[in-house]
């Protein structure tokens, strides 16, 4: 980076995307400061590495900064942003800073409505297994790293590309991955055509020598692959129309086995089996994510045997089918799923992994706008649950809308799920009584799955701690 820039300040530094970039810059030797409204583990980790971070936002916080980095969640009237502009200090969007880091390496950017974080982690693991030591900026905590970031000495930077506000268009990766493309973040895009155009623009930015790795199972992404006439493209998926295919998928508990077939229709070569993979994650969606990572690894000539070993030892990502507690009495899982497609995939994986056990879903809806946009699908995505307990909607800064959802909250969703599911569905008790309520619903051998992108993970860990300490979980 230009030598005049030495001190970089992050507004909202505790966010998962911001903290990863901040950690990379710290490791590269920059002075990093930041602010956030609340404390969390990301902030503690950055402080331990030398960042100066204050709680709350004040104009004085940017003192000495050469640049101020913001996420899309930071408003224009934030006192630190206003102070920076008054002092003519550059205010840099998070994605622009990530793009600057990508200029120093060959970029591998993983985009998609779902599966970005897991796929990013898998790509990093496969490159690491080949001693390529990539730099990593992820949207979740990789368990093997204990962080969402890593500064490697290799030639590649692997990152999650966030499409939520269109800022992934600032990136210029060498390899672009698209896992899927569903209607989401419509408050930003307005129409699904705008979403399609954004993903088209993202993939189009790869150079002529680059590669687009696209999920051929998803109809929208498959159409995108057909449009990329002047780009190198590899498709992957479970269907027999793709270049890299998974077959003979078998799930035992949370372990999945499958065979990988490579097709080469463009050059007339015969299809061949590459071998069998053992993956310590359940679900066809994770098989698909793994195929994407394998496609990237094969492009970079990672030996197959190293891929097999790396995947067998892959420890996963926090809050992605995160097994918090397992014993004969109960199994407790924490998962980030908050979109109907994600919830359906997670619940199917749970049902396949625990076919003889009762499945209890504890769901915290995230944002009024998302519930309104996807109400039809939210009411139908819990078909693999026996019990569904719905928490109040996590606002994430949104105000209640006019109409039944704003007036009655999550009870509207409870009633909708009841109409379209055979599960027992109820509203979870308030903060003071939720543990008592949940504990009273459980039976021996139940599988409890906490779902959501808000603060539901805190409850999941609290509830699991109660069981692990052999205390009464109804009191947590």
From Swiss-Prot:
<keyword id="KW-0547">Nucleotide-binding</keyword>
<dbReference type="InterPro" id="IPR036565">
    <property type="entry name" value="Mur-like_cat_sf"/>
</dbReference>
<dbReference type="GO" id="GO:0009252">
    <property type="term" value="P:peptidoglycan biosynthetic process"/>
</dbReference>
<dbReference type="GO" id="GO:0051301">
    <property type="term" value="P:cell division"/>
</dbReference>
<dbReference type="GO" id="GO:0008763">
    <property type="term" value="F:UDP-N-acetylmuramate-L-alanine ligase activity"/>
</dbReference>
<comment type="similarity">
    <text>Belongs to the MurCDEF family.</text>
</comment>
<dbReference type="InterPro" id="IPR013221">
    <property type="entry name" value="Mur_ligase_cen"/>
</dbReference>
<keyword id="KW-0132">Cell division</keyword>
<keyword id="KW-0573">Peptidoglycan synthesis</keyword>
<dbReference type="GO" id="GO:0071555">
    <property type="term" value="P:cell wall organization"/>
</dbReference>
<dbReference type="InterPro" id="IPR036615">
    <property type="entry name" value="Mur_ligase_C_dom_sf"/>
</dbReference>
<feature type="binding site">
    <location>
        <begin position="112"/>
        <end position="118"/>
    </location>
    <ligand>
        <name>ATP</name>
    </ligand>
</feature>
<comment type="function">
    <text>Cell wall formation.</text>
</comment>
<keyword id="KW-0436">Ligase</keyword>
<dbReference type="Pfam" id="PF08245">
    <property type="entry name" value="Mur_ligase_M"/>
</dbReference>
<keyword id="KW-0961">Cell wall biogenesis/degradation</keyword>
<dbReference type="GO" id="GO:0005524">
    <property type="term" value="F:ATP binding"/>
</dbReference>
<dbReference type="GO" id="GO:0008360">
    <property type="term" value="P:regulation of cell shape"/>
</dbReference>
<dbReference type="Pfam" id="PF01225">
    <property type="entry name" value="Mur_ligase"/>
</dbReference>
<comment type="pathway">
    <text>Cell wall biogenesis; peptidoglycan biosynthesis.</text>
</comment>
<dbReference type="GO" id="GO:0005737">
    <property type="term" value="C:cytoplasm"/>
</dbReference>
<dbReference type="InterPro" id="IPR000713">
    <property type="entry name" value="Mur_ligase_N"/>
</dbReference>
<dbReference type="InterPro" id="IPR050061">
    <property type="entry name" value="MurCDEF_pg_biosynth"/>
</dbReference>
<keyword id="KW-0963">Cytoplasm</keyword>
<keyword id="KW-0133">Cell shape</keyword>
<dbReference type="Pfam" id="PF02875">
    <property type="entry name" value="Mur_ligase_C"/>
</dbReference>
<dbReference type="InterPro" id="IPR004101">
    <property type="entry name" value="Mur_ligase_C"/>
</dbReference>
<dbReference type="InterPro" id="IPR005758">
    <property type="entry name" value="UDP-N-AcMur_Ala_ligase_MurC"/>
</dbReference>
<protein>
    <recommendedName>
        <fullName>UDP-N-acetylmuramate--L-alanine ligase</fullName>
        <ecNumber>6.3.2.8</ecNumber>
    </recommendedName>
</protein>
<keyword id="KW-0131">Cell cycle</keyword>
<keyword id="KW-0067">ATP-binding</keyword>
